[in-house]
Amino acid sequence: KNLNGGNLIVYYAPAGSPPELLRIKEENGVVKKIHLKDYEKQNSADPDVMRSVISEVVSQYPAGSYGLVLWSHGTAWLPSDYQNKLKAFGQDGNNWMEIDDLAKGLPDDLFDFILFDACYMASVECTYELRNKAEYILASPTETMADGWPYEEMMPQLFATDLQLEKVGETFYNHFLNNTYPY
């Protein structure tokens, strides 16, 4: 809730199904999911696919500012073929995206922030590779919980007229500080 009139566009690529584009919209306090498009089967871990989807969204939903949340598995700077192909970002089936490919898939200077809901993406190697992609990068240097970031609490902060990234970080920290599951 509290999207402040903004557009929350979701590229969703569930395992075993073709990707789809969704819009999450709030009307009179009610959150609605609107199906925008089905894509043909494509490799979502391909930088050309990423760039194409971002370009499509930006052209269809012009805005004064953009943020990007990337959710997947992440293993920072280690190459994608290291130890069972588990060292990169963005899994689609058996395909993984190297960090330099991720940088190729993201346009320069478009995003106010990139938030990684993925493990290990706050390394200096990752942030350096993505240095021209966003003003701010929010990420964890270690594992993140499978439940992901507390989006219900963070959405008002991400969609505020005055972007509240410090509060997003505090919300993330406090959420996991106060949540003992699964330990």
Locations of regions flagged by a protein language model:
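Divalent cation-coordinating acidic motifs and surrounding scaffolds
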Residues: 1-69, 74, 78-103
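Terminal, contiguous helix-loop blocks that mediate binding/assembly
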Residues: 76, 83-183
